[in-house]
């Protein structure tokens, strides 16, 4: 390889990947992206995909608008993008940081994409209390760890974390 070639983070030797991810800092970044989604006129949800070395590989805001796509959840859209562009060897070492707990649909997408870990802010239960019966967010109070427990492989779940920060983004957004 030429001296100037920069290898992607996932090509580093395993012993260099032993660093500890700063889960709070990375979750704050996802929560900040949810603020940007809301400022852009969309629902206040976002997530980031992080490689084993802490590099943010992809960012995704909620994609409900402009087409009113009820399946346009940030996590589901990000998993479609990731699973069609990144190698499986990379995905199995990645973590998704998401402003709110993945719903059943998004947890399924995360599972089938093959991610290692989920870190989330607000629980589905708390989100349901915030959004009420808003027709654009019919929340399922079904924790993602239950979805993952039904699978054939383990997905590590960390959360809820930074709940107050994650909830603050939703103030006044749902009615």
Label each residue range with its predicted role.
Residues 66-76, 81:
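A short, polar/charged loop-to-alpha-helix boundary motif
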Residues 80-113:
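Helix-adjacent hinge/juxtasegments
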Residues 45-50:
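Short beta-strand scaffold segments in enzyme catalytic cores
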Residues 57-64:
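Short beta->alpha transition motifs characteristic of CBS
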Residues 44, 95-99, 119:
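Conserved beta-strand segments that form the floor/walls of ligand-binding pockets within enzyme
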Residues 2-8:
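Extreme N-terminal basic, low-complexity initiation segments
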Residues 10, 15-40, 109-175:
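Zinc-dependent deaminase
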